[in-house]
Amino acid sequence: MSRSPDKLALPPPPPPPPSRTVVVALSGSSKSKYVVTWAIEKFATEGNVGFKLLHIHPMITSVPTPMGNAIPISEVRDDVVTAYRQEILWQSEEMLKPYTKLFVRRKVAVEVLVIESDNVAAAIAEEVTRDSIDRIVIGGSSRSFFSRKADICSVISALMPNFCTVYVVSKGKLSCVRPSDSDGNATIREDGSERTNSSSGSSGPTSDSSDVMSSAHDSQSRPLSLPVRRMQHFPAIAGQASVPMETSSVGSDETRCMSLDAEEARDVSSINRSSTDTTSRWTPRRRDYEERKEAMSSSSSNREYGNFGTRFSWSGMGVDTTHSRASQQASNMSDALSEQSYTDNQVNLNFEVEKLRAELRHVQEMYAVAQTETFDASRKLGELNQRRLEEAIKLEELKLKEYEARELAEKEKQNFEKARRDAESMRERAEREIAQRREAERKSARDTKEKEKLEGTLGSPQLQYQHFAWEEIMAATSSFSEELKIGMGAYGAVYKCNLHHTTAVVKVLQSAENQLSKQFQQELEILSKIRHPHLVLLLGACPEQGALVYEYMENGSLEDRLFQVNNSPPLPWFERFRIAWEVAAALVFLHKSKPKPIIHRDLKPANILLDHNFVSKVGDVGLSTMVQVDPLSTKFTIYKQTSPVGTLCYIDPEYQRTGRISSKSDIYSFGMILLQLLTAKPAIALTHFVESAMDSNDEFLKILDQKAGNWPIEETRELAALALCCTELRGKDRPDLKDQILPALENLKKVAEKARNSFSGVSTQPPTHFICPLLKDVMNEPCVAADGYTYDRHAIEEWLKEHNTSPMTDSPLHSKNLLPNYTLYTAIMEWRSTR
């Protein structure tokens, strides 16, 4: 009863191990790829063949240091030496990876072996002998026709065991082959041609003789550029005597692996053509010798002989040979070897003659080159003589010009004397002017010292603000009562309070987020160091709780006034012109601040506050950034890779696209504010709306805020055009704030002041920040005290003579130093000049 076969499929058996292994020795140079490619094409098609990539690197005797020196390994810790060896091994494996991939793509088994040795040839020979490798492929070096020094491939071939065939590859082609002694026939292929070398002995019963021949060949050279002739030993015929046989070889160990690439093949072919006569003389002898050798080989295949016997028998016949016949055969073989030795010596002589002829041709070529160079030198000498004549002509022309120049110099000398007399009279007048300027210079020096002192104080890293206790703020805001809450900012609520008998505003940041803490530090750092009439004044802070105390602005924000929140009266057009100039002046101050410019980054009508006299001040600098100036640009450009920060419709499009922030970003926001001052409309699509109306005066008048009064059409169109230039998409197309925008707004401000004076019918009242808190009048010499408030110098000095506290906060003053407020002084002077 038969059983059905098992339906379960057995896993495929593992691939059998390679039956033969081919070693490919690589140096890691750019030519190693050709060696690997040749080995794959040659042996991968034979079937179950494995490959072993062999690389030799020098022995590690020292470890390099970062200073470029080397320390012997005997003076280094073992773990450092081990790590360095692993690093060298890893580098070798990484170097061999591209060659390994060539085998993987051909789906051929490959093994990588890295050996550490100072003797490359000996290491390769030892590896081949230990694993009994019968085939090895090495790369051949490029050699000159006149080179007589043995290269590395010759040394490797000489050290290889007899059972291993050595293939030398040069330029992607087989250069030469050193066959093993076990090969019956050795075929060398050179650019499509074949040369077959047959051993004179036969296989079969003459294996002992072949072993003896192998030992003889181990000490003889094998010139692979000529056909290889190998002879086997024959045993002694009579008594204990034997006939010694030596293999004739052409060349020495140094020419053992002579390269047969394309160039050298042409040289050898020329040698063969030049030695045709010589070859014709020994060709018949060689043919006769080959016939006799073949007869001897056929007869020796039927012999049987002992270790040292003096007779032998023919197989199949049983006939004993006599001593005379053995002597005759030995004599014939001796004649054949002598004739062959003569023939080989003749070939070597012809080869050396051709070398000398090639050297002679080289010398002749060098002589021709020397003749050419001599001719060129003669030609150049003629050119130099011609140039010398031309230079002589130019020299004569220069002499003529020199004479003319002397005459001209004489005339100039006369003119100089006249000018000198005029200068004497001017010097006398200048001395009188110097006497008049000395007093002005003394005053200027005093002002410069005070300014330097102010700059040093403002540039100090110490924060200059009033420190309020958290309990004081809690009490002033009635524990942050909702009744005192006047607004909600992007980062916290805003409360109105009364601190130290002063109406103020407290802004408390939500400290739960790290970003808010960073925003608080930025705002505190900037506001504590700057003072400007059109920047919101920082009265103090409570850093522990993230609270900032500002001056109170009675008329709220510009946004509330433009959109008439809580039925507030509209701003007349001349007030809007003035506000535009004040905001621009504040931006110029921020952008030109030292040592680092300040970019606001969130400029909008909601962040522009108005006091009781409608004087505008820029606030909410929480998003401001102090940045470094690009030293390669005259107009500073700041690169700050960050996500866009600010308010939609006011953010610079270039900043949104590239993340690069600069002063041009604030100019874009300022342009949007100018458009809103003109139209009192939301910022969305406002630029397109105004551009469409600029072509017609009627359309332009329709888009203006009619509640602002009768706009002067020419000045208003000028302001609208300036606003559109500020809102260009590319920053480089926008005007400069200090050199272009501010001068234009100053002209418009003068027009607005004239209109305001005529509208009110009375003289302009001074802004509140021009008023000294002590004198209740306009300050003549404003100075900043240690409490952060500005006073008239004479009034505060009189106060400090009797008090050590602040007139505004009643808190102790840590210093009685006064800093001149030059910015406010300039504003007061301008205000007085317009009255």
UniProtKB/Swiss-Prot annotation:
Gene3D superfamilies documented for this protein: HUPs, Phosphorylase Kinase, domain 1, Transferase(Phosphotransferase) domain 1, Zinc/RING finger domain, C3HC4 (zinc finger)
The EC number(s) this enzyme carries: 2.3.2.27, 2.7.11.-
Pro residues compositional bias, start-end: 10-19
Annotated U-box domain residues: 765-835
GO molecular function: ATP binding; protein serine kinase activity; protein serine/threonine kinase activity; ubiquitin-protein transferase activity
SUPFAM superfamilies associated with the record: Adenine nucleotide alpha hydrolases-like (SSF52402), Protein kinase-like (PK-like) (SSF56112), RING/U-box (SSF57850)
Segments forming a coiled coil: 340-459
Biased composition (Basic and acidic residues): 285-295, 410-455
Start-end of Polar residues biased regions: 269-282
GO biological process per UniProt: protein ubiquitination
Keyword entries, A-Z: ATP-binding, Coiled coil, Kinase, Nucleotide-binding, Serine/threonine-protein kinase, Transferase, Ubl conjugation pathway
Domain Protein kinase: 480-745
Binding, ATP: 486-494, 507
Bias type Low complexity, positions: 195-218
Location of the region described as Disordered in the Swiss-Prot/TrEMBL record: 1-22, 177-303, 410-457
This protein's pathway: Protein modification; protein ubiquitination
InterPro entries named in the record: Kinase-like_dom_sf (IPR011009), Prot_kinase_dom (IPR000719), Protein_kinase_ATP_BS (IPR017441), Rossmann-like_a/b/a_fold (IPR014729), Ser-Thr/Tyr_kinase_cat_dom (IPR001245), Ser/Thr_kinase_AS (IPR008271), U-box_ubiquitin_ligases (IPR051348), Ubox_domain (IPR003613)
Known catalytic reactions: L-seryl-[protein] + ATP = O-phospho-L-seryl-[protein] + ADP + H(+); L-threonyl-[protein] + ATP = O-phospho-L-threonyl-[protein] + ADP + H(+); S-ubiquitinyl-[E2 ubiquitin-conjugating enzyme]-L-cysteine + [acceptor protein]-L-lysine = [E2 ubiquitin-conjugating enzyme]-L-cysteine + N(6)-ubiquitinyl-[acceptor protein]-L-lysine
Family listed: Belongs to the protein kinase superfamily. Ser/Thr protein kinase family.
Function field: Functions as an E3 ubiquitin ligase.
Protein name: U-box domain-containing protein 35
Species: Arabidopsis thaliana
